[in-house]
A protein has these predicted regions:
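Catalytic loop of the DD-peptidase/beta-lactamase superfamily, centered on the K-T-G motif
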Residues: 1-129
Length: 129
């Protein structure tokens, strides 16, 4: 029996990925259509695995299918506490910052290296004064 990674083989356009992120930002609703219940989004965004466990990223906990910023100073990010999102292996990245009312999507096919934090910084510096 062959088991593949849960994210392997998933494809999307940048526009649809943005719509997905916007739906999460709107507590499960997109263009007047309910996709997920507000409770489902709340559970996704809640920290279920804290950063205090060994091997975890300081300042970032894990919700259900998203990483959640728990301390932006420890994470060295401009994103607000409570921001959430996910990154793919080949350079895709999205996040929602509810406090700043920002949804951002990065679609790249390059190793992640510093591209993701540089993208976060550029977007937040452009929109948050």
């Amino acid at each position: 029996m062959l088991f593949r990674s849960g994210g392997w083989g998933l494809y999307s356009t940048a526009q649809d990925y943005f719509r997905f992120a916007q739906m999460l930002a709107n507590n499960g609703e997109f263009n007047g259509t309910r996709i997920l219940s507000p409770r489902s989004v709340e559970l996704m965004r809640a920290v279920h695995v804290p950063d205090t466990l060994p091997g975890r990223t300081p300042g970032a906990g894990w919700g259900l299918a998203v990483r959640v910023v728990t301390d932006n100073a420890l994470r060295d990010t401009y994103l607000s506490k409570g921001s959430f999102g996910w990154s793919g292996a080949s350079g895709t990245h999205f996040w929602v910052d509810p406090d700043a009312h920002i949804v951002a999507v990065l679609m790249a096919q390059v190793p992640a290296t510093s591209l993701r934090p540089d993208f976060e910084t550029a977007v937040m510096q452009a929109f948050v004064k």
